[in-house]
């Protein structure tokens, strides 16, 4: 029986792994579920899969969660102390699905705990942690297996052939605004941006997909995760989301990774790694794929897609990656709370990148400081807009 910890269990990815585990409960023992504030769903999940412990990040919700679990043997913790406890448990596998920069410190704790496998559904911890985080994982002999469909696809392809690479291409669905013209995009609402045509995702990543800054973050993630030069990375719009990544070699051959667009497939891969297990999901039927479309990204309509490449051209990639991520998180939050318009998101990110000139990143504290400075500048930029 595989022992499992799930961080961010009430989010979109967290709910999917809960479904997978519930369908095969005799194979998994869930040691802890961690969530930010959704106590009702967290309590339901814990009872459903008989989790040993739960942690709620918001300490004000501790008693409510405890009351919901009266009559069970499930242990309840909250806040930072609960997070430290959760990351120190002896488990075979941890799913890191906390959204945004908030995942970085728990990721560091997990790696230091000596866990063997972390399934990473959080690109921001790699974008911001960079080589510091990955070097720590290597030192501790921790295997980080990416959950993002594109990076999971690249990971699987490169597991058989890493030599003589010419290019790695990440595909992008194009998001919910792909078919709109620029004038339409100027006036989109929050509801327009969170309705992704292909993937089931949370609000933040749905907005990132709409601005295509998500793809910029993924380019930086690939740069770090696969130790590949920026000039060997590319993006292609592929609305059907059947091909998730393409690895091209110097001999003219390319290997494409294909599956139906279902995040349960890469999640199951990480759960079974280094083996493979069957999963109840729709399988790819090539005969039903009437066409596969590929479109060059339109950087005029979606300027956010080029920011990752621009960051990778700078002399201080690590700091600028942190600045990009921090400004984006602040701007997306402002958009979701209807404080700014959709096109303001990229404007705020660009202004923050121009204004913040941070020094060398050489420690976790410098990462956190750069993040904090960038958030303040981004917030100030937003305040000046209206």
UniProtKB/Swiss-Prot annotation:
SUPFAM superfamilies: 1-deoxy-D-xylulose-5-phosphate reductoisomerase, C-terminal domain, Glyceraldehyde-3-phosphate dehydrogenase-like, C-terminal domain, NAD(P)-binding Rossmann-fold domains. One of its GO terms (molecular function) is NADPH binding. GO terms for biological process: isopentenyl diphosphate biosynthetic process, methylerythritol 4-phosphate pathway involved in terpenoid biosynthetic process. Its EC number is 1.1.1.267. It comes from the Bacteria. Keywords: Isoprene biosynthesis, Manganese, Metal-binding, NADP, Oxidoreductase. InterPro entries: DXP_reductoisomerase, DXP_reductoisomerase_C, DXP_reductoisomerase_N, DXPR_C, DXPR_C_sf, NAD(P)-bd_dom_sf. Catalyzes the NADPH-dependent rearrangement and reduction of 1-deoxy-D-xylulose-5-phosphate (DXP) to 2-C-methyl-D-erythritol 4-phosphate (MEP). Belongs to the DXR family. HAMAP family: DXP_reductoisom (MF_00183). This is 1-deoxy-D-xylulose 5-phosphate reductoisomerase. It comes from Ehrlichia chaffeensis (strain ATCC CRL-10679 / Arkansas). The gene is dxr.
